[in-house]
Amino acid sequence: MERRFYYTRSIIYGWAVYDRQTNQPAWDACAELLPPVYEGKYGKITVDPCCETEYQAMRLCMKLNRANKEVTMK
């Protein structure tokens, strides 16, 4: 089974985690699958799929794939 999320370096976003379903950075998936970073004055603050380093992108990609697997198994 192919994993839904992958990470790569792009000219526009730098290191980013992408969703294979949309071929775009995984903004929606970060908001839906991962818990919010904190409940702010203007709502939930979620994780940004655009990362500074390859390591951060790899870790976020692993978290998203794990969360997606748990959701699809339910």
Descriptions of predicted regions:
Residues 1-42, 47, 52-54, 58-74:
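Short N-terminal "domain-start" leader segments
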